[in-house]
């Protein structure tokens, strides 16, 4: 596996990230059309993409960092076939080489359905294991998502 770091994505890479998003994230976060995903990407400020590529040159993971409300935020998605094999940690470690602080939303409850009918497993413990702090008093609650804010800071103890 290799990780590519890019400021923009090709049409093929956007399509792969779109498929990952719709296959792996909860169904309520699904984009109906690739144009909606493209709009999402185009509205991210100062973005950087991190692509996890397998031996057959298939994109099996995508992450992006971006500026929102004067903070560096991130999103990350791995194909479920490669989850639990340290590849998510590898991408986070690569991101941490480029950032001093990160913020994100983590769904902190199990029982949410993915589009394929399988359960979405909360990644919260994964983030805690990778040095993130849970901001329990900072939540997003909507019809589409229930999540807690997570943060990471270089050399935070």
Where are these regions (language model features)?
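Conserved GNAT acetyl-CoA-binding A-motif
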Residues: 97-115
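Conserved acetyl-CoA-binding loop-helix of GNAT-fold acetyltransferases
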Residues: 84-97, 119-122
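Short glycine/proline-centered loop/turn elements that form peptide/ligand docking sites
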Residues: 121-123, 139-147
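Conserved beta-strand in the GNAT
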Residues: 51, 57-66, 72-77
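Active-site rim helix/loop that mediates acceptor-substrate recognition in acyltransferases
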Residues: 26-50
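A short, internal acetyl-CoA/4′-phosphopantetheine-binding micro-motif in the GNAT/acyltransferase core
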Residues: 75-84, 108-111
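Conserved active-site alpha-helix within GNAT-family acetyltransferase domains
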Residues: 109-136
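Short amphipathic alpha-helix that is part of the acyltransferase structural core
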Residues: 1-35
């Amino acid at each position: 596996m290799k990780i590519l770091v890019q400021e923009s994505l090709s049409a093929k890479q956007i399509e792969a990230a779109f498929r990952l998003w719709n296959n792996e994230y909860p169904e309520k976060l699904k984009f109906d059309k690739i144009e909606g995903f493209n709009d999402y990407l185009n509205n991210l400020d100062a973005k950087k993409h991190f692509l996890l590529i397998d031996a057959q040159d298939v994109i099996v993971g995508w992450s992006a960092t971006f500026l929102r409300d004067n903070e560096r935020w991130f999103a990350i998605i791995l194909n479920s076939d490669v989850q639990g094999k340290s590849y998510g940690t590898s991408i986070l470690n690569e991101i941490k080489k480029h950032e001093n602080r990160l913020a994100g939303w983590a769904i902190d409850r199990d029982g949410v359905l993915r589009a394929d009918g399988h359960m979405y497993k909360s990644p919260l413990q994964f983030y805690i294991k990778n040095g993130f702090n849970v901001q329990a008093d900072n939540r997003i609650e909507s019809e589409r998502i229930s999540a807690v804010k997570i943060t990471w800071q270089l050399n935070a103890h």
